[in-house]
Amino acid sequence: MSQRRISVIAPCRNERAHVVAFCDAVAAQELPEGVALEVLVADGMSDDGTRDLLAQRCAADPRFAMIDNPRRIVSSGLNRCIERARGEVIVRMDLHTRYESDYIVECLAALDRTGAANVGGPWRAEGEGATQEAVAAAFQSRWVTGGARSR
């Protein structure tokens, strides 16, 4: 029986405060039997210790790989990850986001159920401090999002 390979791709730059929790959350994803996971993190040449933490994770868990993103632009990092991805499905994730342990399996189920080319789940913006909380509230506003069902 062949394995279904899933590629998680994530861009980052100077995410020391979030990188360990993100990696732990991805590593803890509940995957169906026969699903192999690779995690490609495109680092925008971080100078805050993020690269060291990513290197440690990559050394400890062969599913993880750090990809250099010298342009330091999110889209460039995503493109570099996509070039390296070996999965039949690509799951785009972010280091600032908290994921339920069934996030990937629910995305796979939605793909299989609908035949869609792209799926995602609802999300809720949260912030720390007045400015971030105001931005989070705006993201949740129907006026700002135009009533997008994903929010």
What are these model-derived regions, one by one?
Residues R98, D102-E133, A137:
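Conserved donor NDP-sugar-binding/catalytic core segment of glycosyltransferases
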Residues A17-V20, D48-Q56, D102:
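Acidic helix N-cap motif at the loop->helix transition within catalytic regions
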Residues A25, D43-D52, D94-E100:
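A conserved acidic beta->alpha catalytic loop
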Residues I90:
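Short aromatic/hydrophobic "clamp" motif used to bind/position activated sugar donors
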Residues N69-A85, E106:
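Glycine-rich, basic loop-to-helix element that forms the pyrophosphate-binding segment
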Residues D24-V35:
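Short, acidic, metal-binding catalytic loop of nucleotide-sugar glycosyltransferases
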Residues R5-S7, E38:
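Cell-envelope/extracellular polymer assembly enzymes that use nucleotide-activated donors
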Residues V35-M45, I67-P70:
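Short beta-strand/loop segment that forms part of the nucleotide-sugar
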